Each structure stands twice: as structure tokens, then as C-alpha cells.
Amino acid sequence: HLEQHQHRDDLQNTARSILYGILQHTGAELSAHETITAEQDEWASIRQLAAEYETIAQSAQHDRWLGLLRTGGLDETVIDELVSSEVYGVLSTELRRLDAEGHDVDALLPQVIRAGNLDDVDDLGSLLRYRMQKVTSRFTPSTRRRQLIAGIVPKASGHMDPEMELALTEREKLITERAVALAHQAAGEGSSGAARVVLASAHATSGDFLEWLTVVAAYRDRYGVTGPDPLGAIPDADAQRVDYERARAALVALRDAHDASPDAAAP
């Protein structure tokens, strides 16, 4: 029989083993222009880098979420069972997403726990996730700037291990560089459907145009969209649907800006 906290220690040890492997990943040290080449795409794509980022973030923010669970009044036995469950990863990912969107997760998570009716709940993680989604849907988040890497990857924040923070920063830089490089490539070559809607504009590579195109390029690279449709099919998965809506908003902005440009109005 394991003593209290041993389940959590085992989870942390396993996570650190995974992180060690990720940190040895040589492809992460490649520069943006090198990662654009086809033979390096498997390791340097936003799909791969975002997956690494999320794995590191889950471990890096672990203590933060534990603190909020305790603040809400959950006892250690319940917390141990929660973090050992399969749904804990989904919950922590949702907390990071809401935090990056500007919601006050530090205040809201303890509040939804204190709302009660948690006794004998079979799936506490899913219930807390549902409550967080419900309460955050009722109001607009903080006016502070949303913290999204390349417009689609929620940024991890809060106090964390310095080594993990450095690993996150490195991957944030790589994701951003790749997304921007892909956006420039698309705008320069007109190789994607997203690029074609803005190429007629003289300002296609400046300001908001590049930012919006970067979001679309990041989405395509993360989810392997290669067809003529800028965003591909509407996804069924909840997590991808969130990213799809972000990319769709950027695409709409691109088209609206193009339609309003002098070049678009010219006969």
C-alpha cells in the first residue's frame, strides 16, 4: 500500500522522465529557416513543438494547480486520486487555456470547488472542467492581452521550475519563428489558399496582415492541413475546434481587410 503523496511522486517522476527525453530532442535547437526544410518537418513542425510544449507545461504548472485544489478545500486523498486519473491531463490543459484567455483561474477554480456537491463524484476532473467552462462562459475575460503563442497555443504562466520555464521559452520561440516563416513563405509564394486572399493587397506582409496570416499558417502546420481549403474540414474534437475558431477569425479578418483595400476595389 502506497503512503500518502507517493502516487503523486510517482506521477512526477514519470513526467520528469518524459521531459528528459524531450529536452534531449536535438531538433528543437534548429533555427527557423532550417526547420522549414522538408526533411526536418517531422521534428520541427508546430504539431511536434506544440505537443512538446504542452507536455512540459503540464508538469511545469502541476504545483500551481495543486495549490488551487488545496485552496478550494479538497483533501489530500481526493487530490491524489484526481491527479492519478486519466482526466487530470485534460483538466490541466483546460486550466491553462482559460488562464491564457485572460480568465482569473486562481480565483475561479477554488470557487467552483467550494460550490460543493462533490461527494461521491465518479469523475471529479470532468466535473471541475465542466464547471470552469460554464462559469467562464458567463463573462468576458480580463482586458489584458491574451497569451497565445502563434495565435493558437495557450502560453503557460505562473511560478515554475527554471529549467522547465527555459524549455517552454525555447519552444515558444521556435513555434513563433516557424509560424512567421511559414506566413512569409505563403505570402511570398502564394502557395496556400490563405495567402491568395491577401496577395492582392500591397500591405500583405505588414502589421495585422502578417499576424493574421501567421495564425492561419500555424493552424495548418499544427493539424497537417495541406489542401486548398485554408483550414480544412471543421474538426470534431473540442480542443482542435477551439484552435479552428481562432484561425477562422484570423482568416475572416484577412478577407475583410483585403476586401476593404484599394487594390481589391480597383477594376
Name the predicted role of every residue range.
Residues 3-267:
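Alpha-helical structural signal
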